[in-house]
């Protein structure tokens, strides 16, 4: 087993005792940091940064040099799998990700390959190995993937969407085609996350960014069912240590009980869910991650500290809380406000751990 100097993130996910509440930030390697912008400029574009193991490692480590974070997260993108399936990923200025060959029908689904994580996605595994080597056991490394439903939204819509009418048309008019796509994606994500674990990821997270646009029944059928399949297929032990799994559905606060039944170790919460209520509902089964509104980081540090104190008090005494934002950090947040947030979590949380 590789020794970890700081394992409180992994311990909290498994609801084991910790000295203070661990904290990391979604998108902690990102555009709010001037050093990230410099490295991205050096890479040329976003996907070139993702595909260069040394530069991906550099941006992964940048926030850890600034802040005493309790975990590193692989620098990559959720759309690596659709890109490896041959959909022609590109980024339009001001538009976000786009695909040149979106999935429009069952015939398109039938043609999609299941990518080999050590071949078409080998650059991700190289990044994982490089980051693990450079972390030198300081903190654990989180691997991740998008959920099948969230990946499918981009693949069918051809990019980002506000109304999701194209994929919902497929869901209601040709559900068989969508289920075939989701099944193929679930197999791909399982292989991808297991490869990340074998390459050195010590915990994995599934981001279901768009699950919250579904009705409860559709969420069960088209999103949660496939995340459950992935959880069932994941390696849960590696390098002599349990590998915790976190599910995060943005807008999924009403479905926490169903999510906790998947066998995952933790649930991510967005900022619209009350953490005290979430703990009452599912805290006996899973750890909870979250859940400060990312926009709170625009506030003065004293206000940020008040919000941290409120969320810590909401969760209360005992184990099973990883502090995070309710979604990714915004690109124009002052870096010193992120620092005040991390410092406040550690300082104010000690009283909740005996």
Swiss-Prot record:
PANTHER family membership: METHYLTETRAHYDROFOLATE:HOMOCYSTEINE METHYLTRANSFERASE RELATED, UROPORPHYRINOGEN DECARBOXYLASE
Listed pathway(s): Porphyrin-containing compound metabolism; protoporphyrin-IX biosynthesis; coproporphyrinogen-III from 5-aminolevulinate: step 4/4
Reaction it catalyzes: uroporphyrinogen III + 4 H(+) = coproporphyrinogen III + 4 CO2
Entry similarity comment: Belongs to the uroporphyrinogen decarboxylase family.
Protein name: Uroporphyrinogen decarboxylase
Molecular function GO terms recorded: uroporphyrinogen decarboxylase activity
BP GO terms, sorted: protoporphyrinogen IX biosynthetic process from glutamate
Binding-site residues, substrate: 27-31, 46, 77, 154, 209, 327
Function statement: Catalyzes the decarboxylation of four acetate groups of uroporphyrinogen-III to yield coproporphyrinogen-III.
Subcellular location: Cytoplasm
Superkingdom to which the source organism belongs: Bacteria
Source organism phylogeny: Bacteria, Pseudomonadati, Pseudomonadota, Gammaproteobacteria, Enterobacterales
Signal peptide: none
Subunit-structure text: Homodimer.
Family matches, as Gene3D superfamilies: 3.20.20.210
Gene Ontology CC, one term: cytosol
Enzyme class name: lyase
Source species: Salmonella typhi
NCBIfam families attached to this UniProt entry: hemE
Keyword terms, alphabetized: Cytoplasm, Decarboxylase, Lyase, Porphyrin biosynthesis
Listed EC numbers: 4.1.1.37
Site (Transition state stabilizer): 77
């Amino acid at each position: 087993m590789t020794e970890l100097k700081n394992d409180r993130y992994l311990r909290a996910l498994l609801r084991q005792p910790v000295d203070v509440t661990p904290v990391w930030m979604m998108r902690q390697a990102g555009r709010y940091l001037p050093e990230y912008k410099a490295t991205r400029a050096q890479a040329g574009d976003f996907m070139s940064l993702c595909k260069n193991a040394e530069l991906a490692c550099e941006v992964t480590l940048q926030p850890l040099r600034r802040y005493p974070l309790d975990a590193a997260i692989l620098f990559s993108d959720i759309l690596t799998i659709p890109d490896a399936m041959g959909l022609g990923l590109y980024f339009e200025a001001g538009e976000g990700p786009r695909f040149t060959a979106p999935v429009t029908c069952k015939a398109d689904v039938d043609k999609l390959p299941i990518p080999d994580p050590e071949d078409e996605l080998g650059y991700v595994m190289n990044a994982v190995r490089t980051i693990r080597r450079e972390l030198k056991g300081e903190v654990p490394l989180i691997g991740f993937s998008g959920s099948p439903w969230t990946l499918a939204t981009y693949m069918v819509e051809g990019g980002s969407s506000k109304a999701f009418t194209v994929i919902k048309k497929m869901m209601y008019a040709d559900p068989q085609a969508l289920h075939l796509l989701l099944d193929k994606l679930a197999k791909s994500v399982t292989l991808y996350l297991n490869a990340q674990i074998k390459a050195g990821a010590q915990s994995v997270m599934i981001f279901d960014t768009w699950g919250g646009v579904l009705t409860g029944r559709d969420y069960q059928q088209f999103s949660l069912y496939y995340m459950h399949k992935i959880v069932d297929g994941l390696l849960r032990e590696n390098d002599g240590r349990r590998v915790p799994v976190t599910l995060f559905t943005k807008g999924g606060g009403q479905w926490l009980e169903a999510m906790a039944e998947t066998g995952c170790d933790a649930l991510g919460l967005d900022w619209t869910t009350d953490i005290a209520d979430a703990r009452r509902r599912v805290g006996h089964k899973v750890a909870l991650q979250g859940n400060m509104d990312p926009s709170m980081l625009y506030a003065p540090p004293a206000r940020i500290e008040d919000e941290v104190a409120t969320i810590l008090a909401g969760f209360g005494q005992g184990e099973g809380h990883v502090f995070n934002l309710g979604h990714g950090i915004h690109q124009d947040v002052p870096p010193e406000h992120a620092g005040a947030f991390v410092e406040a979590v550690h300082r104010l949380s000690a009283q909740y751990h005996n």
